[in-house]
UniProtKB/Swiss-Prot annotation:
Keywords: Cell membrane, Membrane, Transmembrane
Compartment(s): Cell membrane
Designated name of the protein: Protein 2 in picA locus
Induction profile: By certain acidic polysaccharides found in carrot root extract. This induction may be regulated by the polygalacturonase.
Listed InterPro entries: Acyl_transf_3_dom, Acyltransferase_3
Family: Belongs to the acyltransferase 3 family.
This protein's GO CC annotations: plasma membrane
GO molecular function: acyltransferase activity, transferring groups other than amino-acyl groups
Role summary: Seems to regulate the surface properties of the bacterium in the presence of plant cells or plant cell extracts.
Protein species of origin: Rhizobium radiobacter (Agrobacterium tumefaciens)
Major subcellular location class: membrane
Keyword Secreted annotated: no
Length: 191
């Protein structure tokens, strides 16, 4: 008996693709020009749709114990880490070139010279997928690859989902959604 292929959500894949393009544009506006207003919401849309797809693909397996939270996290890490390491290597090479040439970083608000100790520390924390206690890049993202803040948070949320979310009751889910809605409204009013 053959297994049927996993269900694909073609429309959702398309919407996620468009959201990903907005995200790339937002992170590379020096190449593409000013980002469209409210394009930051594409990150939220992308994560919401990705959460749906992940819950569909892994939720039942996690709930039934067919796969462990550890297996799920290894699969997520294996999916995210290779491309992230490539981006990390490119950014490290970029900063090393700036250091060798004695040029300040153009993507730091302070336009300061590169400190090799900070660069090495940021590279080590980056390889561990952890934020550094300082930033070499724009807007205090605390990662050598500044968009990596979102990947770090995605892995944290994936860990929470794998451990508790897939087995949450309706009452627990409603409570988490209510608290999240309040936090989101406070953040929206603040920022």
């Amino acid at each position: 008996m053959s297994q049927s292929p996993p269900e694909r959500f073609i429309l959702l894949d398309g919407i996620r693709g468009v959201a990903a393009l907005f995200i790339v544009h937002r992170h590379a506006e020096q190449f593409f020009g000013r980002d469209p207003a409210s394009s930051y919401l594409a990150v939220d849309l992308f994560f919401a749709l990705s959460g749906f797809v992940l819950a569909h693909a892994y939720g039942k397996k996690l709930y039934e114990g067919t796969i462990t939270p550890g297996f799920f996290l290894k699969a997520r890490f294996a999916r995210l880490y290779p491309l992230y390491v490539l981006a990390l290597a490119l950014m490290a090479a970029y900063f090393i070139c700036l250091y060798v040439l004695g040029l300040p970083t153009p993507i730091d608000d302070l336009h300061r010279l590169i400190d090799p100790g900070e660069l090495a520390f940021a590279l080590v924390t980056g390889l561990l997928f952890l934020p550094a206690p300082f930033t070499l890049t724009l807007n205090g993202a605390l990662f050598l690859v500044s968009p990596a803040w979102s990947l770090f948070n995605e892995l944290v949320v994936n860990a929470v989902y794998a451990r508790w979310g897939a087995r949450a009751t309706m009452k627990q889910t409603v409570l988490v959604l209510a608290v999240s809605a309040v936090v989101l409204m406070v953040a929206a009013a603040e920022f």
